[in-house]
Every structure is written in structure tokens, then in C-alpha cells.
């Protein structure tokens, strides 16, 4: 299942590379693709290849742990 998300990096201490690495290692996302960067808003559009819907719950946990804002597209 592919899910696009927009991640706001304003309030996070991690870089987009660190976020992608965490998603792929800690949370079993097979493939994280950075589709676009919106410089004005400091946001990234990511395409996540998730194994199943349960990963969406884990995504919420990671977002909470990293203290980032995420929007589903």
C-alpha cells in the first residue's frame, strides 16, 4: 500500500535524511521516496510504501516520538 504524506520539518531537530532512515529501519517501510520539497513551508512530500494498514498506526507513533507534523494526502 502506498501512502503519500506531507511532513513539516519546522519543529523537528532531525533532518529529512534522518527521518527517512528511521522510517525504513525502525518501522519497516520498504521504500521511502522524497517526491517534493516545499521550501516556503519547509515541508517534504514523501511516498511511503507500507506493507499494510497496521503500519499507519506505527507511523503515528513515530511522528509522535519525533515530534513532527504529518498530513496524509
Q: Where are the regions that the model predicts?
A:
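Conserved short beta-strand edge segments in small beta-sheet-based binding/regulatory domains
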Residues: 29-34, 64-73
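A structural detector for beta-sheet-dominated domains
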Residues: 8-10, 35, 49-51, 71-73
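Short amphipathic alpha-helix segments
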Residues: 10-31, 59
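Short glycine-/aliphatic-rich beta-strand segments at the starts of folded cytosolic domains
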Residues: 1-11, 44-46
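Weak global preference for isoleucine
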Residues: 6, 16, 62, 68-70
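Acidic, low-complexity, intrinsically disordered interaction modules
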Residues: 24-57
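Generic preference for flexible, low-structure residues
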Residues: 21-23, 39, 62-64, 72
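Charge-rich, low-aromatic oligomerization/scaffolding segments with amphipathic character
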Residues: 54-66
Amino acid at each position: 500500500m502506498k501512502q503519500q504524506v506531507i511532513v513539516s520539518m519546522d519543529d523537528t531537530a532531525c533532518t529529512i535524511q534522518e527521518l527517512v532512515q528511521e522510517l525504513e529501519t525502525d518501522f519497516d517501510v520498504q521504500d521511502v521516496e522524497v517526491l517534493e520539497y516545499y521550501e516556503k513551508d519547509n515541508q517534504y512530500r514523501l511516498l511511503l510504501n507500507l506493507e499494510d494498514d497496521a503500519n499507519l498506526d506505527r507511523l503515528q507513533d513515530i511522528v509522535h516520538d519525533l515530534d513532527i507534523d504529518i498530513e496524509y494526502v
